[in-house]
């Protein structure tokens, strides 16, 4: 199965997500998203970056956070998700050793 990556130029990305170029520069500077790796010198972003920015915009709207706060919140949410998955896997392993009547 082919793996297709959709990329956006800066202008397309801003139009698609609703962020300004200034906000995009701040978001990239904070490490919330990174430009898509390409030989092209102009920034390009993939569809995953668009999803992250849309999630960030929801946090901004719902919690009235600034971009640095959103960066921290997204980092904590990702860590929480990773830990939940690790916990699920460990519980699955543990259940093999616990007898069920």
From Swiss-Prot:
> InterPro entries annotated for this entry?
CbpM
Q: Which Pfam families match?
A: MerR_2
Quote the Gene3D superfamilies the UniProt record gives: 1.10.1660.10
Functionally, this protein is described as follows: Interacts with CbpA and inhibits both the DnaJ-like co-chaperone activity and the DNA binding activity of CbpA. Together with CbpA, modulates the activity of the DnaK chaperone system. Does not inhibit the co-chaperone activity of DnaJ.
Q: What family name appears in the similarity comment?
A: Belongs to the CbpM family.
| Protein name per Swiss-Prot or TrEMBL | Chaperone modulatory protein CbpM
Organism of provenance: Salmonella paratyphi A (strain AKU_12601)
Task: Identify the taxonomic lineage of the organism of origin.
Answer: Bacteria, Pseudomonadati, Pseudomonadota, Gammaproteobacteria, Enterobacterales
